[in-house]
Amino acid sequence: MRTVAARPARVRRLALWGAVSGALFGVAAFAPAAWLGAAVRAASAGHLLLTDASGSVWRGQARLTLTGGAGSRDVLTLPGRLGWRVSFSGAAVVLTLEQPCCLAQPLRVRLEPGFGRWALELLPAPGGIGQWPADWLAALGTPWNTLQLSGAVRLATPGLRLEQVQGRWRLDGALTADFDQMASRVSTLPRLGSYRVTLRGSGAGAETAAVSLSTSAGPLLLAGDGQWGGARLRFRGEARAAEGSEAALQNLLNLLGRRDGARAILSIG
């Protein structure tokens, strides 16, 4: 009699478990795109927003907006819409991004979760990642909204992998940002120059990555080096005016950093 009585109870438990599992699967399968927007807002501390989102977490689109953070009035939205698609490759999640205005080709990002670790990999983009208007940076607030830059920012990578294991960071590969034909409302010069910022992993299990700043061309000469380790950036550099451009760049040099004679000291961290 106990065995017969136990069977209905077991069946009820299995049915309940099945109903709960089905409900959870249904919620996950049809999770609205707004949920992804909330996650992006939290992860970026309110600097990057997915607005006017439609579709689902797995396949959707939204407008990409940059802000100075919570309470900031500096807001700028890129033209067009950012589309995304989520797929799986073994235990990894692959995110494919498309944006006609700015991405040169579909961008693929691979996320590998694990116990006490995770890895984020930016897959190689032979033709470059994309190009964005430099005035978009003004939405980040100070000092960008003061500099009011114009020009183009191009990103490229041969492949980049960021990994965190039990709180320790490691970066392999490289990411290059080219700031082409920069101009600023703070200066009377039509062009400040073109610059390159490179982030390069140290490899061999190192917990820091090298950061470098160099000038490709132009009257404003920028140079510097630093290290990035997870959430912390340490950078030291300098800004100078090329011969003949000193008077036109004085105000800008004063804004960029502490003056030391003809140069301005750049310091972060």
Name what the model sees in each region:
Residues 9-32:
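Hydrophobic membrane-insertion alpha-helices, especially the h-region
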